[in-house]
Amino acid sequence: MGQCLRYQMHWEDLEEYQALTFLTRNEILCIHDTFLKLCPPGKYYKEATLTMDQVSSLPALRVNPFRDRICRVFSHKGMFSFEDVLGMASVFSEQACPSLKIEYAFRIYDFNENGFIDEEDLQRIILRLLNSDDMSEDLLMDLTNHVLSESDLDNDNMLSFSEFEHAMAKSPDFMNSFRIHFWGC
């Protein structure tokens, strides 16, 4: 792995990143240091990008069953700028507000990117959460139907954003489970 040119982050940039994210100054500096170690040689960190493979290989994401979706949602055309990485870390931080976490969870779980979490999406979510590819079709349908019966308020066999938001607002574990400590900061 290459290294960026060792430019220190400007004080003004650090203040701006703090104002625009839910990250502390130390977390931003820690992420900056990690980014510098991963980015291509000879690039200034604001001009450098990381691939989805580089980001998904970070220890905190490597074990996440949704790492491919997380990377897809937060990257731009499969590449991560430093600001993309900061945005991702901010959403998954403990300080991020519930509405922001719910918005990004919806985007991550909308596998087919049709603006809804439909039966196909729910089945993929269930299989990934249970780490199971050999679940019986009947059990998978039962679990999918149970989720829909609890959350699909208009009975159209899919969750709109507002239905998903309503369901997550009632879930006491959501805020605790939608956190990732990427950088060991």
Curated annotation (Swiss-Prot):
The gene is CIB4. Residues 62-95, 97-132, 139-174 form the EF-hand domain. It comes from the Eukaryota. Ca(2+) 2 binds at residues 152, 154, 156, 158, 163. Keywords: Calcium, Magnesium, Metal-binding, Repeat. This is Calcium and integrin-binding family member 4. Ca(2+) 1 binds at residues 110, 112, 114, 121. Interacts with ITGA2B (via C-terminus cytoplasmic tail region); the interaction is stabilized/increased in a calcium- and magnesium-dependent manner. The keyword Magnesium applies. The keyword Metal-binding applies. It comes from Homo sapiens (Human).
